[in-house]
Amino acid sequence: MITIIDYGKTNSNEIAESLEKLSVEFVISNKESDILQANKLILPNSTDISSSIKKLHLLNLFSILRIVEKPILGIGTGMHLMTKSFKDINAACLGYFPVECKTEEAQQNIFVHEQSIKIIKGTSLLNNISKEDKFYFEGDCFIPRNECTTSVVSIGSEITSTIEREHLYGIQFRPERSGEPGLQILKNFLEI
């Protein structure tokens, strides 16, 4: 079973629709028991990362998420929550990836568009993805390219579009708005 973690103002329902297309058993929840019983977790995109961090703390999920050892996929700001910190709001995040999430350089290049990604490291999350496939990006936050980056997208400069470390995965784009390539990414995560 997959648990999509509900920390308020997320795109959980859109992710749920995509998982339904893949005939996957899932639950949208913020209960500790659902997180611990799940085989895999999804941290969905949120409209406000600061509120998401606060909500995870209020629900006492921050500590649990830091120690759980199961595959986790962060989507959009869900991926940003997986970094060590969010520089612009001076907030500690989950610390899965040893890099800061930023907005300052992206402010001039707020991106809302479909774009292909450049794969720089082969990974199971990117199986059956080609350089012609386009993904839907939106937002003004980003993770700089780093040692965990597996693909990049160019918004003037190259930024991380996918990131991976052990059982932890993050994607900058929105798979539920990326058609078949987005569904393929979700399918790949489910098969990990």
Residue ranges and their predicted role:
Residues A38:
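An anion/phosphate-binding loop that grips the pyrophosphate of nucleotide cofactors and donors
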Residues D34-I35, I64:
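Structural alpha-helical scaffold elements that stabilize or flank donor/cofactor-binding regions
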Residues F86-I159:
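Pocket-forming structural segment of enzyme catalytic cores
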Residues T47-H113:
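Cysteine-nucleophile active-site neighborhood
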